Amino acid sequence: TATITDCVAADLKLYRDRGFEPTEIQADGEYNAVKTLFKDVHFSICSADDHVPEAERAIRTVKETVRATIHGMPYKRLPRVMVRELVTFAERSINMLPHSDGVSDTMSPDTIVTGRPRMDYRTMNLEFGTYVQVYDGTSNDVKSRTLGAIALNSTGNANGDHYFMSLATGERLHRRSWMPLPLSDLAITRVEAIATKE
């Protein structure tokens, strides 16, 4: 319930910050538990075996994008951080261009809702799952200044920063500098080992 509450509150804030005033949320039965917490919005809850068609279609599109991306990568298993970021990557990719059935022919859904200008393709120039060496800071010792990582997703900021998964720890990193390299069998094995260990 706390997760749904936090998500609804964050979404309402995002819309209101852009000058939109949501009056209705169409949802399934899981939202019954939180609808009384949001008095200023009407929750239209569908019946037990029913779904909101627009939401189901959007979910199906994200799943298809995720599935296609997974089948284009050489990994047999993916760590949780890669799966989470892949869903975000799919959603962001879908929403970065105007939709043919959308409210605008020139503005993307992302631009309409967030106010950010259309994402510059230069910030999306790194394919999900690419092996890279990321810059890991400067020091006066002889330790390596780069770290092996797997590209996850653009952060969406104007600097072109990206999120990566560290091959050393499996944790998500936020970096501005990287060097793409050919994907080695060792990197593939390491990604799968991180996934197996979770």
Where are the regions that the model predicts?
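Nucleic-acid-interacting cores, centered on viral/eukaryotic replication and modification enzymes
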Residues: 1-198
